[in-house]
Curated annotation (Swiss-Prot):
<keyword id="KW-0150">Chloroplast</keyword>
<keyword id="KW-0444">Lipid biosynthesis</keyword>
<keyword id="KW-0934">Plastid</keyword>
<dbReference type="GO" id="GO:0016743">
    <property type="term" value="F:carboxyl- or carbamoyltransferase activity"/>
</dbReference>
<keyword id="KW-0862">Zinc</keyword>
<feature type="compositionally biased region" description="Basic and acidic residues">
    <location>
        <begin position="35"/>
        <end position="47"/>
    </location>
</feature>
<comment type="subunit">
    <text>Acetyl-CoA carboxylase is a heterohexamer composed of biotin carboxyl carrier protein, biotin carboxylase and 2 subunits each of ACCase subunit alpha and ACCase plastid-coded subunit beta (accD).</text>
</comment>
<keyword id="KW-0443">Lipid metabolism</keyword>
<feature type="binding site">
    <location>
        <position position="220"/>
    </location>
    <ligand>
        <name>Zn(2+)</name>
    </ligand>
</feature>
<dbReference type="GO" id="GO:2001295">
    <property type="term" value="P:malonyl-CoA biosynthetic process"/>
</dbReference>
<dbReference type="GO" id="GO:0006633">
    <property type="term" value="P:fatty acid biosynthetic process"/>
</dbReference>
<keyword id="KW-0547">Nucleotide-binding</keyword>
<dbReference type="InterPro" id="IPR034733">
    <property type="entry name" value="AcCoA_carboxyl_beta"/>
</dbReference>
<comment type="similarity">
    <text>Belongs to the AccD/PCCB family.</text>
</comment>
<keyword id="KW-0808">Transferase</keyword>
<keyword id="KW-0479">Metal-binding</keyword>
<dbReference type="GO" id="GO:0003989">
    <property type="term" value="F:acetyl-CoA carboxylase activity"/>
</dbReference>
Amino acid sequence: MKRWWLNSMLFKKEFEHRCRLSKSTSSLGPIENASESKDPNINDTDKNIQSWGGHDNYSNVDLFFGVKDLRNLISDDTFLVKDSNGDIYSLYFDIENHIFEIDNDHPELESSFYRNSSYLNNGSKSKNPEHDPYMNDTQYTWNNHINSCIDSYLQSQICIDSYIVSGSDNSSNNYISSSICGESGNSSKNEDARTSDPIIRESSTDLDVTQKYRHLWVQCENCYGLNYKKFFKSKMNLCEQCGYHLKMSSSDRIELSIDPGTWEPMDEDMVSLDPIEFHSEEEPYKNRIDSYQRKTGLTEAVQTGIGQLDGINVAIAVMDFQFMGGSMGSVVGEKITRLIEYATKEFLPLIIVCASGGARMQEGSLSLMQMAKISSALYDYQSNKKLFYVPILTSPTTGGVTASFGMLGDIIIAEPNAYIAFAGKRVIEQTLNKTVPDGSQAAEYLFQKGLFDLIVPRNPLKSVLSELFQLHTFFPLNQN
C-alpha cells in the first residue's frame, strides 16, 4: 500500500488510517512520500510547488475536485487548482514513477470540470475568487461532500469501523494500525510498477499486509472479520463482529472450565508409536507426531485429568483439534478409558469435550477398537455405577467419536453452530451421489431432530454444568 499524504483545503480535522489519507486544515502542502525518501525528484517537486506566485504557503490556493466519490479522487492523478490571482493550473503526479507536472494550458480539463459541476449553471467563471458566487455559495457544501465520500470510502472499501474513522481512544488499536501502516509504507517500494490501478494495488497490498501480520489476528470463519489475538482468549474465542464460536485449544478449554489451581493432569507421558509401521509418501507417521508435538506442546490429541468446577470435583477429557485433527488413536483411546475407570472408582462426574475428525487412519484397526473400548468403560460407569456423564460436542465432531462416546452421554451438550456428523458432506455426496443440504450437519438443525439435549454458548457453560452436577447430587466440597 502506497503511504502518502494528500493535504488540501477540506477544513476537517486531520486523520490517518491504513490508507494514510489525511487532510490538513491549513494549506495545500506538498504531496510527498511518507517514508521521507531522499529521491531528488521529490525534492524538485517541493521546489516547483513552492515557486507559485513567490509564496511560501498556499493558504490562498483553491482546490477543485471534479469527482462524485473518493474512488475517483484517489484514482485520478490530475487536479485542477486556482491560485490567489485567479490563475488556474492542472497538476499531474505519478507517485510510483516520481513524476510531477504543472501545466497552465488546460482548456479541455477546465471545460470538463465546468460541465460536470453546478459552476456552469451559475454562469460564472470569475477570475477573482472573492467575488465568485460559486465559491462563496458552495464551498461549505462541497467540502462536506468530499468529507462524506472519504468517510464512506474508508468504511466500505478499507473495512475500517466507524469508531476508528471518528477517532478511537483504544491506544492498542491505534498502535497496531500505525505499526502495520509503517511497515506497509516501506514495503510498497517492492510493488509491481506495472500495476496502474490504485484500487487494485491497494486491495492486493492490503491482503499482503494482512498475511504478514496474521500472527496478530484471528480471522472469523463465518464473517471473515479480524479479531485481535491478544484479547481473543479473554473473549472465549468468540468473534467480536458476529459472535461466532471459533475453535479453542484444549488448554484454553481447561482454563475456561476448571477452577484455577485445581487442574491435575493424568497420563501426560503416554505417547504414540507406529504400531502398524504406516508409511506415507508425504511424511512418516512418527515424524508427523513429532511435528504436532512441537507445534502444540501436547503429547497427544487429548488432555485428561481431574479438577474442580465451581468447587465440584470432576474428571474431564478435552480433545484438541489442532493435534492431527483431534484424531482418535490408541493413545487417545487409552487415556480416555483410564480417565473413565478412575472416575468410576472415585465416583466423580465425567466431562468429555469432543473435537475430532474421527479415528486415526495411520493406526488402522487399532484406532477403530478404541470406540468399543471407551464405550465398554462408559457402560460400567453409567449403567452399573449410575454415575453422570456429559459430553460437550464442539466443532467439528465427526467420525468414530460421534459414533461412540460423543453420543452416549446422560445429557448431551453442543456448542452453537457446531459441525456434527458421522461422515463429511463431501464423502456423503461422492458416495451416495446425492446433494447434502447446507446446514443439515449444524448443531441447530440436529437439535430439532433430537440428537442432543442442549445448545449452550461458552459464556454460561460453566454455570450450566455446575447446576447439572448439583441436580445429580454432586455438590461443592466446601458446601455445608
